[in-house]
């Protein structure tokens, strides 16, 4: 991720998923890394995919549902990143940046959900 923040959430979630994919390319191909990376690739992509679906809502109930799924996927991405950080010493700084980004996604999505209530 660059130093300049992306404020469009669709673009920002795309950048997060992309950056997670760049990360997994560079990690050692251990059994645990392969499994954790598969999960990270899925969950990081789902953050943005569900956010996009929320924007194409079929109603308020669908909007909240999709936003909650997007937030859940951000939480899950954070979990996989934390596991990867513990087992990949040489990539800790890069992974920590992604953990912070996942956390920011959670906060942003929570704020949107709370405004809808």
Give the predicted meaning of each segment.
Residues 1-117:
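Amphipathic alpha-helical assembly/interaction segments
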């Amino acid at each position: 991720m660059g130093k300049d923040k992306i404020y469009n959430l669709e673009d920002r979630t795309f950048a997060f998923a992309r950056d997670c994919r760049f990360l997994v390319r560079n990690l050692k191909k251990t059994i645990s890394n392969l499994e954790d990376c598969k999960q990270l690739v899925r969950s990081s992509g789902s953050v943005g995919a569900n956010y996009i679906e929320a924007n194409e809502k079929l109603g308020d109930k669908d909007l909240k549902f999709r936003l909650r799924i997007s937030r859940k996927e951000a939480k899950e991405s954070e979990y996989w990143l934390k596991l990867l950080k513990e087992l990949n010493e040489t990539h800790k700084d890069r992974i920590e940046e992604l953990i912070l980004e996942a956390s920011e996604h959670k906060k942003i999505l929570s704020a949107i959900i709370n405004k809808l209530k």
